[in-house]
Amino acid sequence: MELSDANLQTLTEYLKKTLDPDPAIRRPAEKFLESVEGNQNYPLLLLTLLEKSQDNVIKVCASVTFKNYIKRNWRIVEDEPNKICEADRVAIKANIVHLMLSSPEQIQKQLSDAISIIGREDFPQKWPDLLTEMVNRFQSGDFHVINGVLRTAHSLFKRYRHEFKSNELWTEIKLVLDAFALPLTNLFKATIELCSTHANDASALRILFSSLILISKLFYSLNFQDLPEFFEDNMETWMNNFHTLLTLDNKLLQTDDEEEAGLLELLKSQICDNAALYAQKYDEEFQRYLPRFVTAIWNLLVTTGQEVKYDLLVSNAIQFLASVCERPHYKNLFEDQNTLTSICEKVIVPNMEFRAADEEAFEDNSEEYIRRDLEGSDIDTRRRAACDLVRGLCKFFEGPVTGIFSGYVNSMLQEYAKNPSVNWKHKDAAIYLVTSLASKAQTQKHGITQANELVNLTEFFVNHILPDLKSANVNEFPVLKADGIKYITIFRNQVPKEHLLVSIPLLINHLQAESIVVHTYAAHALERLFTMRGPNSATLFTAAEIAPFVEILLTNLFKALTLPGSSENEYIMKAIMRSFSLLQEAIIPYIPTLITQLTQKLLAVSKNPSKPHFNHYMFEAICLSIRITCKSNPAAVVNFEEALFLVFTEILQNDVQEFIPYVFQVMSLLLETHKNDIPSSYMALFPHLLQPVLWERTGNIPALVRLLQAFLERGSNTIASAAADKIPGLLGVFQKLIASKANDHQGFYLLNSIIEHMPPESVDQYRKQIFILLFQRLQNSKTTKFIKSFLVFINLYCIKYGALALQEIFDGIQPKMFGMVLEKIIIPEIQKVSGNVEKKICAVGITKLLTECPPMMDTEYTKLWTPLLQSLIGLFELPEDDTIPDEEHFIDIEDTPGYQTAFSQLAFAGKKEHDPVGQMVNNPKIHLAQSLHKLSTACPGRVPSMVSTSLNAEALQYLQGYLQAASVTLL
């Protein structure tokens, strides 16, 4: 694409269309942009539009499109073509910083994100002048430019907070510190001076405080991994100024908005984070500053209001106290009884109250409320911070703290009892306080794993939780109902089983509650209870114990999906999946009705898939329905095909990318259920599965390979006779997969199925070419994963076609190649093979090479016979060699570029481990002994001589053990 006015005009028109609400106009425009984004100059055209276009909407659209383009395409993925040509990459890096800094803020943010994406890949090695260019802009004095630099630096450096320590990371941080720490410190001091100069200028202060927030965030990122020498030397400057800012109160920066945090609150929040970081990680160096910060933050807490805009500030301030009180160094600051009482009264209890804003979120923004309360994303809430502070104080003062707070709990419950309809918030706070007190350690998966023994959880459950849940009106006091259900979920490992069993029908009843939070919590609680394990690792609750409630459970779960706001509720669908899994055969009578409802739901959500977890659990539930029913009645598979195939066809025809990998997995499960040949409905699909476009999406690959394997397992003869012209296409797929380091193992899965199941004559003409392709890949790019897969394949080939056939095909490609493969690959690398089935295949294959390949006994290959036997005994007896060369450590990590749908494995569509050797060989060691005995009878005297003269003593001892176990000898 040329950088021409005509192309700019065309691009403008298509960008306009991508904003059209009508899908008939929008989607073709999106498809067009996708189709041209591989062309040279495409990204430069977008950047040119940012400079030249007069239409601000188009400029914003171009900036978002550019950022998403960079996100999808900048990373260079090994084995895949470079999606952006080098000239475009150079031009982008040369222009983007200047363009970003000269753009309005809305566009600046998009370009800043794009720079951070590029920087993540290219900085510092491929973009060494980025920092210099950014730091030089600090001299401009223009805070629009300076804030653009700071925002970009923050995007670039914030990953230092999450990266694992490594020499490479520390080298990069040191490079950044050398270039950036001093200019940042000078800018910090200069900005604070300007704040004093412009103390009465509200608009100037807003810009300056935006800078201070970004500077404080950068301080956090640059200090997170370790305390840099520069910041240790300049701690006085930073901490004194942080303390000053923490105590600052400028009326010009106060906002009337009760919801949105202002600049002053955001800055103080970040300073609390910075102080907490130093208190936790660098307490020795920070010790002399700590008392001043404790005092300042305490004063902040007792003087800050309950408005939502202060939530982040208050939670960060409390988190600071929590991090301090957990450190043995600072224990003395909290041990006084009056201090503990004061903290409880002035900080913890007020911040555990259920405010009007919380009530509003509970009723009107339930999804966000659930995300915060149930999923642990409440990290910046007052309640979560107060809970963490209770936990921190209990570390050293469990007895006194429990005593003080128990008094508050009793008092709150008494207030509630006086007038429940008015005082229900007191009980809510009491439940939360008990939860905080009792929870010493907690995980998402298991609930509370360590509890405060001073709190009687069962007694509290019986007296204060159960009565609320037993109330006939499921819609009364919804917040308390949600609290009670959450209590069961959190303390499920502490409350005795008999009480949990009593709770199950109550929870089922609450699936009918109108409140989204209540019926969601009920579904979540049931799902968690159904996954609990008893002492023998079986589920704590048996299908028989839940049997009395099966019908009402299933009815209420599916009805809950029809309640307003819960049509795609992932917790309900997960509970449906878990109920199916627990109840097994008990659900069979209901499946005809349930599969209809699931299919209708699938059709509805396929129009616009927006809830990935819901969709995943829905497909899991479909798989469970198939598995459970067809286990006792395989013929019922036809009913599922009738119910599902119309919807599946629509999904495939409409190219619903999110669902296609799931559809293939369910189809594999259905096809594998057929015991005889492949039905014609599947064979009609077979040619379409080989289309290259399907294989372009990495998320499709595992599911497609599994489906092709199912075709080969169930219908290899049909494919050989009715679709022989498709075999080259099948091998073309294999060729594409083995060329990729990320997907070569999938190529071998497919190849192994072809070798195992296809009639030999149907692949005869392709065999040599298959081996040539494998040797080319070995030569060009040998990885441990590839070697392991290659070893399994050649041994499977040996089992299927015979040892002599393997030797002949190798030597047919190149004379003496068989010996090279033995010497360079099989003997030295066999120890790396892992997995019971894989080891068994290799053991049986190598046994065949040792005992059924005449050239091994009477040619130049004979010298390799004993080393091969030694390596096989090593495979049996030595630990697996799991060493991986340094440069390969990350090859196996599947990195899905850009926005491509990642593959999500359906647990209940899982394929049983297939053993191609099967009953033919039960014990490979005995099989080796018997095969060696048979060989020794054919050529008496040779085998004992070769074994006794060349095998090492330890291996010989193991071999004698195998011979004894098989009751045979070598003649």
From Swiss-Prot:
N-acetylmethionine, modified sites: 1
Keyword Protein transport carried by entry: yes
Residue numbers bearing the N6-acetyllysine modification: 574, 824
Residues covered by the Importin N-terminal domain: 29-102
Stored SMART domains: IBN_N
GO MF, one annotated term: small GTPase binding
Gene3D superfamilies membership: Leucine-rich Repeat Variant (1.25.10.10)
UniProt modified residues of type Phosphoserine: 112, 931
Keyword field contains Cell membrane: no
This protein's UniProt keywords: Acetylation, Cytoplasm, Nucleus, Phosphoprotein, Protein transport, Transport
Chief place of localization: cytoplasm
Compartments where found: Cytoplasm; Nucleus
GO biological process: protein export from nucleus; protein import into nucleus
GO CC list: cytosol; nuclear envelope
InterPro entries tied to this protein: ARM-like (IPR011989), ARM-type_fold (IPR016024), Importin-beta_N (IPR001494), XPO2_C (IPR005043), XPO2_central (IPR013713)
Family as reported in the entry's similarity comment: Belongs to the XPO2/CSE1 family.
Record's function text: Export receptor for importin-alpha. Mediates importin-alpha re-export from the nucleus to the cytoplasm after import substrates (cargos) have been released into the nucleoplasm. In the nucleus binds cooperatively to importin-alpha and to the GTPase Ran in its active GTP-bound form. Docking of this trimeric complex to the nuclear pore complex (NPC) is mediated through binding to nucleoporins.
Subunit description: Found in a complex with CSE1L/XPO2, Ran and KPNA2. Binds with high affinity to importin-alpha only in the presence of RanGTP. The complex is dissociated by the combined action of RanBP1 and RanGAP1. Interacts with CFTR.
Protein name per the record: Exportin-2
Organism: Bos taurus (Bovine)
